[in-house]
Amino acid sequence: SGLDEAGWLAPSAAEGWSISDVMLHLAQSEEAVVSSVTGAQISLLDSIPVVGDTVDEIMENRVRAERGDPFVIFERWRTARRASVAALRNADPDARFPWAAAPLRPQAMATTRLAEHWAHALDIAEPLGVDYPDTDRLRHIAWLAHRTLPYGFGLAGDQPQPIYCELEAPSGDTWTYGDPAAPA
């Protein structure tokens, strides 16, 4: 990684979390994928009580419960990431596995992992002054964002409705999601 201990313990852009805390959160979420898909417990995560009223509060409490040596946490993330990729690759593509908002198929769960890693990479790169340019790989995150709009509407207490999105990709290409006849 190239970071020394001071770098790992520096504040991230995720309020209240160090860069090491962000990596711990990512490690925990990858371990949760493995647990969901395979039923195997690969960490102590399942033994940490679920405390909080929202996903954010639960994640905050889990990070707080497991803070530790940043170099160990980074290796934990690497191990969990490899296990998560293997679990999703080997899963029945039509099966649905429990996840935060609703059961997901492996492809959708993998896309959520891309989105979470992208968002948290920004939390890490920005405070370190590392350039993190947008690329057309963001299309997966755009797809996920459109796909989860009904969930977002529901959380806000609004009735989900079809929405058409037309986005300009970093390359200048146009990405479209939804029915063009739906409101934009």
Per-region residue spans from a language model:
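Low-complexity, glycine/alanine/valine/leucine- and proline-rich hydrophobic stretches
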Residues: 164-184
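Short, conserved, surface-exposed binding loops centered on an aromatic residue
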Residues: 153-159, 166-167
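Hydrophobic, proline/glycine-rich low-complexity stretches
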Residues: 1-6
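Short secondary-structure transition/capping segments
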Residues: 50-62, 90, 135-148, 178-183
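Internal, conserved structured core segments that host functional sites
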Residues: 67-119
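Conserved active-site beta-strand-loop modules that form the wall/rim of enzyme catalytic pockets
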Residues: 116-117, 162-165
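Short, contiguous alpha-helical
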Residues: 9-50, 99-156
